């Protein structure tokens, strides 16, 4: 079984790039199938309204639950005070299995980590090159699984990647 744990799907409400405009799955599924990928974790495209984006993603996941697993997207700043409710809805109503957070939106918060702990789900946190908080996450939330994509830097910042590798060695 090969799992792709980082695939955006659906429509965002921005127009700056594919990450916030539209992430259709047809071409992706063709390539994934050819590569032997049997399951995909889907994440909503960037949006100014992640509650809506999560609902839309739930419909996509429900269309092929044997193939797709959903992670809800939350915004640490805009969703402050309602993260627990958003995550609870995503896990219990939509059947999602994790949380997605992006540093581009705002730094991860205790509210998000506490929701992950409460529901016992992983957090996929794109740190966007800011790897220092990963050590704090490892020590403050040792019982929460954190997935740090792109080796800590989408832009291939080797300094950030080496720093992340060092932290991973110290906090396996």
Named regions from a protein language model:
Residues 1, 36-40, 64-70, 93-97, ...:
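Short, well-ordered coil/turn segments that N-cap beta-strands
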Residues 1-56:
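An N-terminally biased module of ancient metal coordination in phosphate/nucleic-acid-related enzymes
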Residues 2-5, 41-44, 71-72, 100, ...:
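Active-site neighborhood of phospho(di)ester-bond hydrolases with catalytic His/Asp-centered motifs
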Residues 8, 102, 152:
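Catalytic metal-binding/acid-base residues of hydrolase active sites
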Residues 23-29, 51-60, 84-85, 131-136, ...:
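Alpha-helical scaffolding within the catalytic cores
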Residues 32, 61-65, 91, 138-139, ...:
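N-terminal cationic-hydrophobic initiation segments that often serve targeting/anchoring roles
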Residues 47-125:
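Active-site gating/metal-coordination segments in enzymes
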Residues 105-172:
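Catalytic pocket-lining loop regions of alpha/beta-barrel enzymes
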């Amino acid at each position: 079984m090969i799992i792709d744990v980082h695939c955006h799907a659906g429509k965002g409400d921005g127009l700056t790039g594919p990450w916030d405009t539209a992430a259709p799955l047809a071409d992706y599924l063709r390539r994934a199938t050819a590569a032997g990928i049997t399951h995909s974790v889907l994440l909503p495209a960037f949006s100014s309204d992640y509650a809506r984006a999560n609902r839309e993603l739930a419909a996509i996941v429900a269309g092929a639950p044997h193939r797709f697993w959903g992670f809800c997207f939350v915004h640490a700043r805009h969703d402050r005070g309602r993260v627990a409710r958003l995550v609870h809805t995503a896990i219990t109503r939509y059947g999602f299995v994790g949380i997605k957070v992006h540093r581009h939106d705002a730094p991860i918060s205790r509210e998000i980590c506490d929701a992950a702990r409460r529901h016992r789900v992983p957090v996929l946190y794109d740190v966007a090159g800011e790897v220092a908080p990963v050590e704090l996450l490892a020590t403050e939330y040792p019982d929460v699984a954190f997935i740090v994509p792109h080796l800590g830097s989408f832009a291939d910042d080797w300094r950030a990647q080496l720093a992340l590798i060092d932290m991973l060695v110290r906090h396996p």
